[in-house]
Swiss-Prot record:
Full protein name: Sigma non-opioid intracellular receptor 1
Location in or out of the cell: Nucleus inner membrane; Nucleus outer membrane; Nucleus envelope; Cytoplasmic vesicle
Superkingdom of the source species: Eukaryota
Domain-related comment: The C-terminal helices form a flat, hydrophobic surface that is probably tightly associated with the cytosolic surface of the endoplasmic reticulum membrane.
Residue(s) at site: Important for ligand binding: 124, 170
């Protein structure tokens, strides 16, 4: 009887998880999104090759003009270290929701490692430096330069390498909470830099609050 109960519980759990995944997939396939990867890439490409700090300032100004209420204010912008997959970089989150994010990303030192495998599509447009990618199932790598956009498809895994001084604009679309395990695992279990963990969680929550506030305002609730 104990074995039967265990099997029944397992069936219920698997069934519940399957329904949850199907619901999320249906929701993501039919919801309206704020950004498109083409729009973000086109905007970033205008400033490729420029000094990255000046380029980022222009990108932020233009994003705020095009998407009012969806980009964090200056007082909430913060460069935060990211340790994941063996590499180390820094990000500045501009927008965050359950299904989208926009951020500035890069590194001041040579670094590389595993890309991670996500339930999300991620695209990066290079402003400065070089990015090298070795895709799963291939025997050769490709190198990308300022103005290039690299698309990391959902479920894909690659080896990644950035040269020092590589900076880019990144847009992600998918079930964003599913990416946090990879993004935070090294911080939690390797570097144990819990201050960085706090900074990361805080800015993501701020992005979620801003998005919720904008949604309620546009819906006429606030």
């Amino acid at each position: 009887m104990s074995l039967i109960r265990t099997i029944l519980k397992l069936v219920v759990v698997v069934g519940f998880l399957s329904l949850t995944v199907q619901f999320i997939r249906h929701w993501m396939a039919n919801k309206q999104y704020v950004f498109t990867k083409e729009e973000v890439a086109k905007l970033a490409k205008q400033y490729a090759g420029q000094d990255h700090e000046q380029a980022f300032s222009k990108v932020v100004v233009e994003l705020r003009r095009r998407y009012p209420g969806h980009i964090l204010p200056d007082e909430d912008l913060q460069w935060v270290f990211v340790n994941a997959g063996g590499w180390m970089g820094s990000m500045c989150l501009l927008h965050a929701s359950l299904t989208e994010y926009v951020l500035l990303f890069g590194t001041a030192v040579d670094t590389g490692g595993h890309s991670g495998r996500y339930w999300a599509e991620i695209s990066d447009t290079i402003i400065s430096g070089t990015f090298r990618q070795w895709k799963e199932g291939t025997t050769k790598s490709e190198t990308y330069y300022p103005g290039d956009t690299i698309v990391h498809s959902a479920g894909e895994a690659t080896s990644v390498q950035w040269s020092s001084g590589t900076w880019m604009v990144e847009y992600g679309r998918g079930f964003i909470p599913s990416t946090l395990g990879f993004a935070l695992a090294d911080t939690m279990f390797s570097t144990q830099d819990f201050l960085t963990l706090f900074y990361t969680a805080r800015v993501y929550v701020k992005g979620m609050i801003l998005e919720a506030s904008t949604f309620l305002t546009e819906s006429g609730v606030l």
